[in-house]
Structures are given as C-alpha cells and as structure tokens.
From Swiss-Prot:
Major location category of this protein: cytoplasm
Natural source organism: Akkermansia muciniphila (strain ATCC BAA-835 / DSM 22959 / JCM 33894 / BCRC 81048 / CCUG 64013 / CIP 107961 / Muc)
Enzyme class at the top of the EC tree: transferase
Function: Catalyzes the methylthiolation of N6-(dimethylallyl)adenosine (i(6)A), leading to the formation of 2-methylthio-N6-(dimethylallyl)adenosine (ms(2)i(6)A) at position 37 in tRNAs that read codons beginning with uridine.
Domain Radical SAM core: 156-389
Entry protein name: tRNA-2-methylthio-N(6)-dimethylallyladenosine synthase
C-alpha cells in the first residue's frame, strides 16, 4: 500500500488545504506516514508570507531529494502559495521536483501524482538518471468554484476541533503582502454548504469549529442583508444552530468591513468564543496608509473597545509588523502605545520581510535589520509582560476548557484551550479528551496554564 507524507508550512488555511489533499489520497488507498524515508509521495504545502518560510521549504525539499536518491520512484510535489508565486521557476531551484500545484488546484493533486506514477510505469523508468525526466507537471491556473472543493475531512471522529474553509482569496492588496497574488480574488461558499459540512463534523463528534478565510469577515459580501445583518453574521447564526457544536471561532478579520452587526453577534451568540485574533499591523496612521490598510488607528482601537463592551471577557490577540519601510522611531512608539492601550492577550510580532512583486519591496527608506530586531525585541517584551500578567490573574479561577487530547510534551496530561484561547495543561484521565469541563487553574508559567478538573457535584 503506497504511503503519503505531507509537510505544511504557514497558516490554518494551509493546514486545512493539506487535510483535503490527504483525504483524497487516503480514499484512493494510500496510508499517511510521518516518516519521509518510507513515503512514496512527498508533498510540501508552502507559505510565501515571509522569505524565511520559503527558504525552509526549499531547503528541506532539496535535502530530502538528495538523501533519497536511492529511491527514484518517489514523487516530490510543492503545493500552496510559493508554488503559485514561483510556478515553473521551482523546477530550476529543485531539479528533483515533479509537481507544482497552485492554491486553486488542491483538488487536482491526486490525479497529477497518479498521472506521474503511471507515466513512469509505462516508460519502465528503472534507471535513476531517466526516472527524473519527462514527468514535470505545473498546474497553477485559476479555477472557478475552487473554494467549494475544500470540504472533506480526514478522520473527523478522532478529534474535537476542526477547521472549516468558508472562502478563498483576498482583494485588499496590502503593500507588504503577497497573498492577494497567490490566493486570487475573494470567493465565498454558500451558507448551506458550510452548514452541511459543520453538521457532518458535529455528527462525528467535533465540538469546536474554526471558520477560515483570508479576511473572514468579508465572507458573503455579495449576499443580501437580512435584518441588517451581512453575510458573515448570517453564516455565524446558521452555524450556531448546528446541534452538537459547542464553540465557534473565526480567523482572521480585518478592520475594513468589520460591521456593527459582527460586534453585536458577541452579545447574543454564546457559542461564539471569547477570543478574536485581530491584526493591527501598526499603530501609526502614516504607516497604515503606506501599508495600504485603509483605516486609521482610531478606528481599530474603537472596534476593540466596542467588542470588549459586547463581550467583557473577550481576549484579543494580534499581528504587528515592525520595521516597515519608512517607519520612524515616532511611528514605532505609536505602535508601542497602541499595544499598551489595547492590552493584547498576545501578539505575533514580525520584522518586515520584503516579498518580491509587492509594492513595499521597492519602497525607499528600507529599515536596517538591526533596527527591526531592536524594535521587535522591545515590543515583544511589552507584549510578554502583559500576557504573563493576564495569565497569572487567572490562577485560582475556574475556566471552561475543551480537552483536545494528550499533551505533546507530557502524555500523562491532556491539553486544552479556554474560550479565550488560553492553552491549559490538565491532569485528567485520557478518556476525558473531547470533553468541555470546568477546570480550576492552579498555576501559570507565563503563556501556559495548569489546572485540574473541578469535583463533580452530587
């Protein structure tokens, strides 16, 4: 029985896409493996958001191909955003590569791999030097309806959480971001199809779903409003009605299109988790304008305030870029000030990384790496201090925790998350995995909480 190995880089959307690909192969008789040296097909799902992610994927794929020269039958494929961006160029960088598949062609991966294998068998390519030739496939063309092809799941009955892709594409075109060029225009799935997928997951035992989109709150912009509610809130309400689903999350929204109906949803949809990941990117209006993010920081801060009024226990996490071209010390200090004002529960802080083909890559006044690093470390210290204090304040409280499964670092413990997306390690029996239980928080080690189940009553 042939074996498939998939390595995924980047965001939750990539993880979901990889799962769809894996499901297709398993349906055709493949088994999954976590060992590259026993795989017959090796696929990487790549990320282009930063250069480091691209270099990791390129380096790893090149190393694997060299290490396995004695296994000429293995098919090597690159999928995802880097595949979409670099296209045939990847065959020059990775001579052993067989397949390049773009972001709208995940549903074609199996047929391409199968075609490559059949071609090799027909030609009886037994010699190492000829086994690599004539099998290159590059499929990066746009395909209508591709957003509706990411709908199948791999073994949904063995876990309590799942990602659900509700749309693809992005049309905001921030100056630093390659995603609009790799993911295409915005395309939304019908509400009915999303709800059917969520029902299937609930029937399999899933209790928490995370709705995915490049800018998730722009879902269904072409839909008619109903009672003053846009398409995304209509979808949230429909998913909320699915029996068996206990928690709903969504990532990632954008201040543009973040309507009051979405703020209000936090007041009447109890399954909506008390957490939002809400990218700020900069606290400077001047830098936001240069980034082509068409809002003022005041708008962002006001949205944070209104969301916390709607859901007082809401935790807010964010993304921030430091060292964007032209960022002055004053601009950076405005970002630092905004972080202190919002009191984020956590933040991903990135040093600006030029991406080929984006407007920011050719802007003047590129910031020296040592300045980027200094600002990164300074802001990280501010964020960490806030996050550690907030977690410490939870010691002694009782939190509802979804126990997701064994801890990766200690199999004797279960790991889970609160509604606020705080990771919790729990001393609990393995058969409690998948349950949502009240957990007394006994310790905080900074970013991780530790607790025990509360005694059952009666």
């Amino acid at each position: 029985m042939p074996k498939l190995y998939i390595k995924t880089y980047g965001c939750q959307m990539n993880e979901r896409d990889s799962e769809q690909v894996a499901r297709m192969f398993v349906q055709k008789g493949y088994t999954m493996t976590d060992r590259e040296d026993e795989a017959d097909v090796i696929l990487f799902n790549s990320c282009s958001i930063r250069e480091q992610a691209e270099q990791k994927a390129l380096g790893k794929m090149g190393l694997l191909a060299k290490q396995q020269r004695h296994r000429p039958h293995v098919v090597y494929g690159m999928m995802g955003c880097m595949a979409q961006s670099k296209k045939e160029e990847l065959f020059k960088e990775l001579p052993r590569l067989d397949l390049v598949v773009g972001t709208q062609k995940y549903h074609r991966v199996f047929e391409h791999v199968d075609g490559i294998l059949r071609a090799r068998q027909e030609r009886r390519m037994d010699e190492l030097q000829t086994a690599f030739s004539g099998t290159h496939v590059c499929d990066v063309a746009e395909e209508a309806d591709s957003q509706n092809r990411i709908r199948d799941h791999l073994n949904p009955g063995v876990r309590s959480t799942a990602y659900v892709s509700i749309m693809q594409g992005c049309e905001m075109k921030c100056a630093y971001c390659i995603v609009p060029y790799t993911r295409g225009a915005e395309r939304s799935r019908p509400i009915r199809d999303v709800v059917d997928e969520v029902k299937m997951l609930a029937d399999a035992g899933v209790k928490e779903v995370t709705l995915l989109g490049q800018i998730v709150n722009r879902y269904g912009r072409q839909m008619e409003t109903a009672g003053g509610k846009g398409g995304f809130v209509q979808l949230l309400e429909a998913v909320h009605e699915v029996e068996g689903i206990r928690r709903i999350r969504f990532v990632s929204p954008h201040p543009i299109g973040f309507r009051q109906d979405l703020v209000q949803a936090f007041t009447y949809l109890p399954k909506l988790c008390s957490h939002i990941h809400f990218p700020m990117q900069s606290g400077s209006d001047r830098i936001l304008k240069m980034m082509r993010r068409p809002y003022r920081n005041e708008t962002y801060l006001d949205l944070c305030s209104r969301m916390k009024q709607a859901r007082p226990d809401l935790s807010i996490t964010t993304d921030i870029i430091v060292g964007f071209p032209g960022e002055t010390e004053e601009d950076y200090l405005l970002t630092r000030q905004a972080v202190e004002q919002v009191q984020f529960d956590n933040a991903f802080i990135f040093r600006y990384s030029p991406r080929r083909g984006t407007p920011a890559a050719v802007m003047e006044n590129q910031i020296p790496e040592e300045v980027k690093e200094a600002r990164n470390q300074d802001l990280l210290a501010v964020v960490n201090e806030i996050a550690i204090r907030k977690n410490r304040d939870l010691v002694g409280t009782v939190q509802e925790v979804l126990l997701e499964g064994p801890s990766k670092t200690n199999a004797a413990r279960l790991s889970g998350r609160t509604s606020q997306n705080k990771p919790v390690m729990v001393d609990a029996a393995p058969d409690l995995a998948g349950e949502i239980l009240p957990i007394r928080i006994e310790e905080s080690t900074g970013f991780t909480l530790y607790g025990v189940p509360c005694p059952s009553r009666g």
